[in-house]
Amino acid sequence: PSVNQSPHSPQPPHSPPKLTELRPTDIDEITKLVLQSPTKQCELDPIPTSLVKQSISVLAPIITNIINLSLSSGTFPSSFKLSVVTPLLKKPNLDKNNFSSYRPISNLSFLSKLTERVVKDRLSAHLSKNSLFNTFQSAYIPFHSTESVLLSLYDSIIRAISKQQVTCLCLLDLSAAFDTIDHSILIHRPLIISYFQSFHLDVC
């Protein structure tokens, strides 16, 4: 400690390790991800997903090279950002002539979704390895779900009751929560690298 600093003075918060690069993928990982993927079709796909699976031994090296070029260059290809948007009525009783009654469902190409999966796995591994997930978070964490939240909540209530304590529960549900966030703020956080800036730029 410095002359003016007590040994017991509060220390500055620990800065989490930065995610500066994305580890390249390989043929084995791509093969596994492709075979595990749902056989869904998108109008933007040049060939059916089922055919990609059947020909994975031939296509895996090509797909691996394309995704690795995207990762190494820090650029999410513009063609991967294109999607087929289908308006879906939120509730049966809503006004069908009102645009706000619909939820836009975007269907991306198979290669785009595959690239997202590769990046997601690396980001999740980084967050997990460095203990960056919130202690009470259940979303986007392997082996966690809404059931995890309910079990934790139930356990807390039971413990409080056993101690004759009063329990108050406040629930907050934000409509279109992600859309209310300024994405430019998110992608400028220290943990986010240029790849994610490229991902959110000019999404169609």
Task: Show where each model-derived region lies.
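Surface-exposed loop/turn segments and immediately adjacent short secondary-structure elements
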Residues: P1-S100, S106-L114
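Alpha-helical recognition domains of nuclear gene-regulatory proteins
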Residues: L33, S50-L51, I66, S70, ...
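Conserved catalytic palm subdomain of right-hand nucleotidyl-transferase polymerases, strongest
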Residues: P38-I47, N98-N107, V149-H188
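Conserved short loop/turn motifs at secondary-structure junctions
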Residues: P46-S55, Q137-P142, L171-A177
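Catalytic-core region of right-hand nucleic acid polymerases
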Residues: N68, A177-C204
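Residues immediately flanking
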Residues: K90-K91, L111, D121, L172-L174
